[in-house]
Every structure is written in structure tokens, then in C-alpha cells.
Amino acid sequence: YARLYPTLGFHPVSLSPVPGRLFWQTLNESVWLVHTAVAYDCIYHTLSAKQRTTIEKNLFAPMADFIMDGMGDNHANNKTFNKMHNHATWATAAVGMIGFAMNREDYVNKALYGSDETGKRGGFIRQMDYLFSPDGYFTEGAYYQRYAIWPFVIFAQCIENKLPELEIFS
């Protein structure tokens, strides 16, 4: 993937206004990166410094940048990244988790507080405040909760481990 990703334009099947590169939509890129960030964290110390640099420089950083900002003239990803919607939750979880794995504070901050890092326009913290009712009901509905809740849980666990001062579960 580290050799392939830099060569990719938009996926040839363009069924989405938010197209991906590896997959037909950016949502799938985000889901893939969430799972891959977990795997990368597990094997990080088994890789040489050169391998880590190659993977991070050619795959993870460009993918995180793409998820946040898009590519070329298509900046729909930035709008999605800052939305109050499960697609944005997957995106912020992906960028934040790979940010933790790569020790990229800039990615973690954008994931937590939105592209502008103010928390006023987007970000995981804002999603936690707006996508759940006061009684804890997920606004997109129970019928969708199994898919949409997972990035909240896995990213919150990462936040709790890396930034316990945020008291994410409180």
C-alpha cells in the first residue's frame, strides 16, 4: 500500500460526491484506516525505522490528509470531516488514531477539534456533544447504531489511553 497509494488518483468507480482513492468513497478509506491504525500500533515496534518512515510518509500521512481535505479541486472531504454525521466520526477516528500511532499531534488535534482546531466547526469532541441526546440516544437511530457507534468507542479508548486528562468517558 505504501508503494501503491502515492500513484492513485480518485477511485475509477465514482458513485459518491466524496470519492475515495483505494475505495469508491472516502468513508471506506476512513473505516480501513481505523482498522489499519489498530494493526499498525500492534506491530509498530517490530518495524525498522526505515519501514515506519516509508509507511507513514507514503501511506498514512497522505491518506489522513486526503480524508481531511480531499484532493485536487474536490474538497468535499473537508466538509465531511467537519460534519455532525457518522461519516465524520469515522473520518475523525481514522485521522486521530493514525495520528496517535505516528505521534502526530497535529492530526490528533484536528481529529478532536475539527480542521480549524477550534472545536466550533467540527471534530470528535463536538460530535460527542451533538450526536447524542441528553439521555444518551444516538441521533442517527438505534437501527444504525452498531455501525456508527464503533468509531466512537475505539477512538475514545485511544483518547483515554493517550490523553487521560480529557476525561473522555466523563
Can you describe what each PLM-predicted range is?
Residues 1-170:
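Aromatic-lined, polymer-binding surfaces characteristic
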